[in-house]
Amino acid sequence: MTERRVPFSLLRSPSWEPFRDWYPAHSRLFDQAFGVPRLPDEWSQWFSAAGWPGYVRPLPAATAEGPAAVTLAAPAFSRALNRQLSSGVSEIRQTADRWRVSLDVNHFAPEELTVKTKEGVVEITGKHEERQDEHGYISRCFTRKYTLPPGVDPTLVSSSLSPEGTLTVEAPLPKAVTQSAEITIPVTFEARAQIGGPEAGKSEQSGAK
C-alpha cells in the first residue's frame, strides 16, 4: 500500500502565537495524563512513590512526607513532566460512524507537522529545531502512530488544526452491510403430459391403438 500524506486545514485565528506557553489546566486533553498526576494535591504523594520516573530517595534526615523530599524530587519531576508534554497529549474517540484522534501540538508551527497514512496506520510527526524560550533553548521531536479501524478508507482521512493548537485527525467508519430481506420462492408443479412435451403425448396415443 502506498504512503499518503494527509493535508490539514488551518483553523487558527490571526492572533495565534505558535510559541505561547502551555497551560494544562485549560486543556481537557490533559485528563489523559500518561502517568502524570492531574491535580496539584496529588503531586506530594507521587513524589514519594518509587514507581514514578523522577523518584529520588530522600536524605536520612528528611522523611518521605517532608518538604525536603519534595524539594529534592522537584528537578527530576520537572524533567519527567517536560518529557511527557513535549511528545503531546492525545485522546481517541470512536462513534458509530466516525473515528477521531485529537493531539495537543501547540508547541509546533503548522509547517513543522506532518500527517500521513500507510498500511492502515496514521502517523503524526512534529519537529522543530532548537530555539529559545523563557527557560533557555529547547528542541522538540515526536512521532505518534494510530491504527485505523478495519475497513476505513485511508484516502478519506482528514485533519485540521484548531486555534488552541489541537490537531484533529478523523475518518468516516464503513457502514455496516445490511442483510437483504428473506424471500420465499414458490415451487410450481407440472402435469405428466407437460413434462414429456407434445411428442410424449403422441407416442402414448399410438401405443393405445
From Swiss-Prot:
Q: Name any one Pfam family assigned in the record.
A: HSP20
Residue numbers of Omega-N-methylarginine PTMs: 12
Q: Where is this region: Interaction with TGFB1I1?
A: 74-209
Q: Does the keyword tRNA processing apply?
A: no
**Domain sHSP intervals:** 80-188
Q: What is this protein called?
A: Heat shock protein beta-1
Question: Which BP terms in the Gene Ontology apply to this protein?
Answer: anterograde axonal protein transport; cellular response to vascular endothelial growth factor stimulus; chaperone-mediated protein folding; intracellular signal transduction; negative regulation of apoptotic signaling pathway; negative regulation of oxidative stress-induced intrinsic apoptotic signaling pathway; negative regulation of protein kinase C signaling; positive regulation of angiogenesis
Which residues are annotated with the PTM N6-acetyllysine? 127
Instruction: Name one cellular component (GO) term.
Output: Z disc
**InterPro entries xrefs:** A-crystallin/Hsp20_dom (IPR002068), ACD_HspB1 (IPR037876), Alpha-crystallin/sHSP_animal (IPR001436), HSP20-like_chaperone (IPR008978)
Task: Read off the CDD domains from this record.
Answer: ACD_HspB1_like
